[in-house]
Structures are given as structure tokens and as C-alpha cells.
């Protein structure tokens, strides 16, 4: 610990080292959040045009994003209802009902954290992920809003990614985490165990 503390110019006590790394992690988190926001903002125009083109072809779209103001901007630009944190349950239900029952309501904008559980949005079979979450579980919960019982059409998930940006890093992280959570024992592993036991 003393050597590590000397390298970082900190007090050699464990508490001081933890505090030092916590401060570094906090700063990194702030930078990542800023990068995500900048990247999402850069994608807004393309996302709006993409949704309008899809709407012109008769497709209803669910657009998922992370940042509150990104969700609000999309909802305003596309004149669409939204599901966002802090809404009353009545507003959330009204937005959902409008999207599900009104044939002229072509888009629903959702906050990934506010709408990734407990909502059925099967009026659409297309989702645009503008900002991906960090975990495979949250990603799959979000996409499951349109891919669930009651969906009668094939589902397509569109991921809007800027190459060589924080987007690419997030999707690489999602891929790595997904691979790490795959079952360790497969059918071939079971067969090998059975073969070796004879």
C-alpha cells in the first residue's frame, strides 16, 4: 500500500487510497456521462429524420434514450408522447394508451430507465436505440417492450451508433458482458462429461 500511495502521492492509509480512487472513478464517470450526452446530441437530427422516414412508410416507432433532455427533445420534435422518469402514473398510461390505440400516433419516446420494465408497446415492431444502457439486462428489458406476448410482427431493433465514439465502447462492453454471462455448461460440455464418466 505504501508503494501504491507513493506512486499516487497519497497518504498510505487504506482509507486515503480508497478515497483517491473513488475521486478518480467519479471524475471518469462525469467524463463518460458528458461524452454520452454529446454523442446523443450529435445523433438527434439523424434519429428524427430516420423516424419520420419510417413513419412515412407506415411504421410506428419506439425510440429509447437515456438522457432526460434527449427524450424531451425527441418528443417535442416528433410531436410524440413520452415515458420519462418523474411522470405521474396517469401521464405514463396516457402516453402508452395513445401510442397503442391511436393509429395517427406514430412514435413513442421512452427513457430507458423509466420504461424498461412493465410496459407493453406492441403497437410497434421497430425500436430505435439512440443511447444504449451499460448492461445487457437493461438493454434486453428495453427491447422487450415491443418483443413480447401480443406482438404479431417480426421485431427489428435499430441501434444508432457513431463509430469510434463512446457508442462503440458501450456496445463493445455490452457484447463482452453478454458473452461473460452465457452459460458455462453447454450441451457439448455435458456430453463430454458423460463420455468421460464411462
Q: Can you name each region flagged by the protein language model?
A:
Residues 1-59, 66-68, 74-76, 177-197:
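Interdomain linker/hinge connecting the two RecA-like lobes of the SF2 helicase core
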Residues 60-64, 72, 79-115:
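Conserved helicase ATPase core of P-loop NTP-dependent helicases/translocases
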Residues 61-62, 98-99, 126-128, 134, ...:
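A generic "structured core" feature
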Residues 64, 110-111, 129-131, 159-161:
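Conserved beta-strand segments of the P-loop GTPase G domain that flank and frequently precede/overlap
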Residues 70-74, 117-120, 138, 169:
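Phosphate- and divalent-cation-binding pockets in alpha/beta enzyme and binding domains
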Residues 84-86, 130-133:
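Short beta->alpha connector loops at strand-helix junctions that form conserved
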Residues 119-132, 155-159:
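A short beta-strand element within the Helicase C-terminal
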Residues 134-198:
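A conserved SF2-helicase RecA2
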